[in-house]
Amino acid sequence: MEVIILQHIKIEDPGYIKDLMIADGWKLTTIELDEGDKIPNNLDQFNVMFCMGGPMDTWMEEKHPWLIEEKKRIKEFVLEKKKPFLGFCLGCQLLGEVVGGKVVKSDPSEIGIMNVNFLEDKKKDALFSTFPDKINALQWHSYEVKNLENNKEITLLASSPTTKYQIFKYQNHAYGIQFHIEIKNTTVNDWGCVPEYKSALEAQFGDGALEKFDKEAKANMKQMNNFSTILYSRFKSEILKI
């Protein structure tokens, strides 16, 4: 399998899922967009696209002009080529915008280890049918996808009290996942070094919030790693058919 990974900051990669892909011998091509990497002109060689999180937001095209091209290439991969896509956090929001939604500020920001509740359509979904009806996942976002109701090719799979579109899919090959289960033991401390992430965390919980958040994440790490393993296994068998 050949995978193209769109990254917006080096420390936000597919994490635990990346380790699983490497163990399976998959060929990974990482495009570090914030560092000036360009998306290849020809996407035909890639079986899968991952689109990860980042400290910028989808509307920041003037500050980050590469976002314009990124959205075009996601549209090409998902809508035109109809190839498998997984988008996490910012990647989820980029997919949402590409398929006709709007990305708006969350009220309030969603930060912490929080509940995600699956909906009825989860039971017949290829990726998430074996997940429990409620899971704990790491949230660290201040924007979210809205206004996808009129797109009949969108299925809403999971929500939280703050964010309606925690998981949605376009047709049956492209998924937006607003939360994080792909994290590892070092993730929270690594992300806490990013000024935008740290300020959002401390604005909500005060000074010293990072240490508490890290401890809470590690207490839930085994479960999130298990969910990542299930997601990856189902992605291989049900979406890629391997």
Model-identified regions with their sequence ranges:
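Flexible gly/pro-rich beta->alpha loop and the following alpha-helix that scaffold active-site loops
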Residues: 19-85
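Cofactor-binding loop segments of dinucleotide-utilizing enzymes, especially the Rossmann-like FAD-
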Residues: 6-8, 33, 90
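Catalytic nucleophile loop
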Residues: 78-102
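Acyltransferase
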Residues: 183-242
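Short N-terminal binding/cap micro-motifs at the start of the first secondary-structure element
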Residues: 11-16
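Extreme N-terminal starter segment of soluble prokaryotic enzymes
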Residues: 1-4
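Glycine-rich His-Gly loop
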Residues: 7-9, 51-55, 142, 179
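Pocket-forming structural segment of enzyme catalytic cores
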Residues: 100-186
